[in-house]
Amino acid sequence: MRDLPGLPSRRSFLKASAATAAIAGIAGAAKAETKPEPAALTEYKPDCLQPTEWAFVMAAVARLIPSEGDGPGAIETRVPVFIDKQLAGDYGKASDWYMVGPYEPAASPLRGWQTPLNPLETYQQAIPVFNEWCKQTHGKIFAELDPETQDKALTSLQKDEMKIKPELREFFSILLANTKEGYFSDPMYGGNHGMAAWKYIGFPGARGSYKEWVGKHNVKYPLGPVSISGERG
């Protein structure tokens, strides 16, 4: 095809179009990767936890993974948000668990979940019981205690010194497990904000190629983590 004088050639037009599309794609990707900061925990509106339950979760995870360590704490990584969202979803309802009796609360933990209560119901029933025990033992509900007393109260819960009813005996275990999960999960689930926990331990996240590093030990990984959604830390 002959190019007309004074007009751009077909080849020049295609080159310019390709360059424009590439630039637009880069700009669009950069814009897509820029996400607004989520609401502060003090302003966050829980999906399922009631105010007293939310206050307990906030206080409890802050003691299980405290902020005063050499890495980020549970509050900085938004673990409470992860727990709230998990309890509001299939996990909280035990949607894909076998929940048909009989139940034997005194059975070994190796025999699995031995209560008719799902995780959300366990939180909902255990928190008021624990708060009442804290009031009777320490004078205030858990969230209002000082950090040292909170640690003592959580230790009592862990050791079953308060003799919580058998149906709720898994409460501390799932609270601790959910806290760990929220700390190390992919940010898409609400916790591990900014991949701070992954950065702290040097975990590469969901990188597409990691084979060349599988056999390398005691060598610091030089690149930051990548989330499932493609965010880079």
Annotate each predicted stretch with a short phrase.
Residues 2-21:
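N-terminal secretory signal peptides and thylakoid transit peptides that target proteins
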Residues 2-3, 41-43, 52-59, 70-233:
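Mature-region segments of soluble proteins
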Residues 23-27:
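Hydrophobic h-region of N-terminal signal peptides that target proteins for export
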Residues 29-34:
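Boundary at the C-terminal end of the N-terminal hydrophobic targeting segment
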Residues 35-49:
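Short N-terminal segments immediately surrounding and downstream of signal-peptide cleavage
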